[in-house]
Amino acid sequence: MQRESAIVVVVDTLDRVLLLLRPQWIGWGAGQWAFPGGKLEAGETREQAAIRETEEETQLKVRDLKEVKIPVDNKLTMFYTRDYTGVVKIDWEHDDFVWVTRDEIENYDLAPQVLEAYDWVLQNG
């Protein structure tokens, strides 16, 4: 059975989003750019998991999460925030990170729904 997951679209003051590069060995989404996030642990809410995973993967502390309202798998919840502190330092689960604008993002091999989520945040967030 698939576990529930949560991800966070982190947006900076220039409307750039944070993308993380998934390594080739990781399996699903290998070599693609994606938002920070991951699976829920026992007893966690989706928001708690999103906050924890973002900090584990990037060292950023995120707050004031709001839900991205696009159709996604019912096991996935997408959040966004413009409220974060810290400096990005990626963990072992990723090979690189980048802050990208809407014009730049289409030059990247993106995980599913990344572009759709970014557009939704720019229009609604």
Language model region names:
Residues 57-63:
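Short secondary-structure junctions
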Residues 1-18:
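Conserved N-terminal beta-strand and adjoining loop/helix that marks the start
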Residues 3, 12, 62, 69-107, ...:
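Active-site-adjacent beta-strand/loop module that shapes the phosphate/pyrophosphate-binding cleft
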Residues 16-52, 56:
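Conserved Nudix-box catalytic region and its N-terminal flanking loop in Nudix hydrolases
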Residues 19, 66-69:
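A structural microfeature
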Residues 64-67, 115:
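Residue-level detector of family-conserved "landmark" positions at structurally sensitive sites
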Residues 115-125:
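Charged phosphate-binding loop/patch that engages nucleotide di/tri-phosphates or the phosphate backbone
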